Swiss-Prot record:
This is Large ribosomal subunit protein bL20c. Binds directly to 23S ribosomal RNA and is necessary for the in vitro assembly process of the 50S ribosomal subunit. It is not involved in the protein synthesizing functions of that subunit. Belongs to the bacterial ribosomal protein bL20 family. It comes from Stigeoclonium helveticum (Green alga). One of its GO terms (cellular component) is ribosome. One of its GO terms (biological process) is translation. It is found in: Plastid, Chloroplast. One of its GO terms (molecular function) is structural constituent of ribosome.
Length: 124
């Protein structure tokens, strides 16, 4: 069987990883084994954090909504319940943007919901 020399292929593979880890600190950018471990961990963490980002933004929108609604005397869950009663299908991101960028519109929305919520609670 003929001998296969892997020098070029192996060097290319190592160089590719070392190029990726160029900005890493210490040995993680110089030594192949450490760089490879850091590269694998970086890929894993980027995968995890792409999902975590969605959770974090949703909780941020909810916090902003809660703060905006509490100014008017309700809390978050009562506000969302009132939206469901009135069949207003705005997501939390949109509501959060409205509360920050256009408070007059948000107050108008709140003023339309408040009587309906009180009416619904009194009927039960």
């Amino acid at each position: 069987m003929t001998r296969v020399k892997r020098g070029i292929v192996a060097r290319k593979r190592r160089k590719k990883i070392l190029n990726y880890t160029k900005g890493f600190r210490g040995a993680a950018s110089k030594l192949f084994r450490t760089a490879n471990q850091r590269y694998m961990k970086a890929l894993k963490l980027s995968f995890v954090n792409r999902r975590k980002k969605k959770r974090d933004f949703r909780s941020l929108w909810i916090s902003r909504l809660n703060a905006a609604v509490r100014k008017n005397g309700l809390n978050y869950n009562e506000f969302i319940f009132a939206l469901k009663i009135c069949n207003i299908n705005l997501n939390r991101k949109t509501l959060s943007q409205i509360s920050i960028c256009d408070p007059q519109t948000f107050n108008l929305l709140y003023d339309t919901l408040k009587p309906l919520l009180i009416k619904h609670l009194n009927t039960k």
